[in-house]
Amino acid sequence: MNHSAPGNADKHGESLAARFAEAPHIAASTTDERRFESWLAELEPAQSARLEALLVQPFGRNILVGIAEFSPYLFDLVRADPLRLIRLLECDPDTHLAALIAEARGAVLAAPDEAEVMRLLRRMKAEAALLTALCDIGGVWPVMRVTSALTDVAVSSVQAALQYLLRQEAARGKLFPPNPEAPEEGCGLIVLAMGKMGAGELNYSSDIDLIVFFDPDATTLAPDIEPQPFFVRVTQGMARILQQRTYDGYVFRVDLRLRPDPSSTQVAISRDAALHYYEREGRTWERAAMIKARACAGDARAGEALLAEIAPFVWRKHLDFAALADVHDMKRQMQTYRGQSEVAVEGHNVKVGRGGIREIEFFAQTQQLIAGGRHPELRVRPTLAALDVLASSNWITLAARDELARAYEFLRRVEHRLQMVADEQTHALPDDREAVERFARFFGYPDREAFARDLLRQLEIVQGHYEKLFEGDDPTGTAKLPALDYSAGPDDPRLFQHLTTLGFKKPAAVAQTVRDWITGDYRVFRNEATRSAFIEFVPALIDGLALAEEPDRAVVAFDQFLGALQRGGRLITLLGQNRDLVALVALVLGAAPRLGEMLARQPQLMDGLIDPRFFGAMPDRRELSGRLAATVQDAASYEEFLDRLRLFGQESLFLIGTRILSGTVSAQQASTAFADVAEGVVHTVHDLVADRFAAQHGRIKGQETAIIAMGRLGSREMTASSDLDLILLYDFDSENPDSDGPKSLQGAHYFARFTQRLISAFTTRTNYGVLYEIDMRLRPSGRAGPVASSLASFADYQANEAWTWEHMALTRARVVSASAEFGERIAGVIRDVLTRRRDPATIANDVADMRRAIAQEKGETDYWDLKYAAGGMIDIDFIAQYLQLVHAHHKPDILDVSTLQVLDNAARLGVLPQSEAEILRAAARLYHDLTQILRLCVSDRFKPETAGTDLQRVMARAGDAPDFSSLEARVKETQSEVRRVFRALLEGTSPASAR
């Protein structure tokens, strides 16, 4: 029997009885079978005949006999109303449930008094309870459809009760709803469904967890009505309607204790008090609870607004591994309280016991808490949906997702069957074997042993995954390391021997450094909790640093890093929970001090290294845009928006840089990634500044603005230190030059002010530094020209005034932010300029003159100045630009913003000999590879004699050389070859120069 089967829900149109796919296991000739048969015989003949006709279907009789034998509660429902049972067996269950809920809501609206409301809701609940039980026991609905049906009944019941009460209050003149038919709209009362109700996963006999808030400033109350007493009374009335036991039973037990500080607060809490509590006192378990929170009744708009305001409490901006320990402590306390520390069968609690439902929920919720702030896609309510997203985002494996999902569905069915026995919110199996035997047969198993095998297998699978997340990796890192006194220093022979065994060449110096960490006066350790956490982490840290290519240098680099670190509690926790990153961080600190300084200033940059996507494929522009949008979407102010943009930019630089150092991306991939990040940031800033500027100054009729990327951003060849070369172009209806805002500006002045505002968004120094340095000297007339140009003046300048070097720069021009139509117009202007007929000799002379001028200004004798050295990258760029300007008129396919692509195009079109193209392509790739490393690791000129061996090793690997001296020889030889080609093309008589 498959107890996590998908159900028989797809056979729409057939009766429920015809869709049964499984049933309890009935032993031959039981007393309870005779009990069922005698009840059947007592029915009126017409009812008995209809029922017998339905029970000829497979499984139907065994389901009802099983109910009679194992579930007093369900058999009471069966006997109470035979016609109801017949109606259910004849119905399509999905259609019937929807109609049942709708009819009850309609009847409540017309109910004359509260007693009738209570009777209507209880009868709806009883019929829904029997229907969902039949669908669950008979395998008609998968278990999560059952939970969703139960949730639909609960939500509708809460809404109906609340709506009735608000209509009564309106009739008394205490409430003035804009829409009397829907008094909840705009009333300011918010009912949040929590837990399984919030996630649409309600169990069979569940309480419903609700929190009630109200917004006293946004109600429809009469002027003389105090909000809190009013809403407390309404909340109490709602709970009474739902849970008070009457002749017809109850609807749902209501639990209001998940509200802030329930022992000292009223059952309805003001919005401001709630926000203040969550901001100041909210605990991790309350954050976890809020993952599933959903506005289910009352003022829906106010509910969604409140959840948005609570979101920063739930979803932290940075990875939150502290939640891991908090949630695990909570779980241990529950197990201790309930005595559920081992997997078992008899007496085992399938909810909070080892391997139970709660461990699956905590497994998902904890990882949602850790990463949901950075990854909004993880903010889903249902447990199975959370497992799906965790798997698709690579936080867990697909195998783990599948195993946990199967276990979850199995255990939820066990839980339901336990609760169906007596309509009790129980989660524990019976304490004796005989009772478990009976339960197993109710669940469809032939005996206890068959059930126990399946149960224990699922519990052990869950326990294994849970322990791997919370316990198995030993967060302190000390389980597998020798018990040593790391504060003993170099005089301890055991520590000395251990460090030697790990591969440290200077164990005494390392031992002294470690003692300094533990006992010294580092700023980061002035917080005693941080020092204690670090001391626990030291064994794992030393183990990780020993894996670096040069362990002794890694220790020195980490020591310097600790000295620069202002605050580091989170960083120590992150490294402690992710010990495999220690060696990578050591590489970063040793080879790229610039990145180390960034990490010391902003320890949260580590978050990206822990993201499972870090070592996957580089994100494309679309994915980056999504991440950027998620980063800034809920910024509370313009200043916070700027901070988040800067943090996004710095983290992106740090992550791409780390991947360059670790050799997991090529230089070309890194160039593209840097450009994609910059382009996304430019587009985001452009849109936001435009909207803010328009709010103040309005818009001009027909206005368009565009940002053109030049230089390295234009060619998508950026490095970690590239600034942004930008030009801003605009257009508008010249006959209507005034903007329509409260502070109107005219024409060119409007766009000049807008451009200055745009530059400020990039260059203003905030707590997170500068976003990008902006260079606009490539605009028409350079520094002498206006900061923004109209498209018409730009086109005229390029056609009639621009110098050759400006047209060379234009070969890299690319529109990165504009409307599609305006962007195409600009691209057309650029294309027209570049495809003009030009004299090859004149262009060659201009390019050669410019190269000589740059050499005079910058020098060209330092062969490690890969850009300006004779035969360096400038030579290759100038060759590519020369070839485009000379040949684009009759071979427009040569045009491209990328130097490498231009060289490919030129060779393919026959305007550059293949041999020379190959020399230039190989050189460009080498220079790109090395330049990415140097821009990342060196802030000034590169000097081999002072470069550390970590950096030399990384450079040799990037240059595909066996060692650094071989790399030097290759660089010199390459520059000689490139300079030869440059002279042949631009200073000599090569056929390519005039072809």
From Swiss-Prot:
Its EC number is 2.7.7.89, 2.7.7.42. This is Bifunctional glutamine synthetase adenylyltransferase/adenylyl-removing enzyme. Residues 479-995 are annotated as: Adenylyl transferase. NCBIfam families: PRK11072.1, PRK14108.1. Involved in the regulation of glutamine synthetase GlnA, a key enzyme in the process to assimilate ammonia. When cellular nitrogen levels are high, the C-terminal adenylyl transferase (AT) inactivates GlnA by covalent transfer of an adenylyl group from ATP to specific tyrosine residue of GlnA, thus reducing its activity. Conversely, when nitrogen levels are low, the N-terminal adenylyl removase (AR) activates GlnA by removing the adenylyl group by phosphorolysis, increasing its activity. HAMAP family: GlnE (MF_00802). It comes from the Bacteria. The gene is glnE. It comes from Bradyrhizobium diazoefficiens (strain JCM 10833 / BCRC 13528 / IAM 13628 / NBRC 14792 / USDA 110).
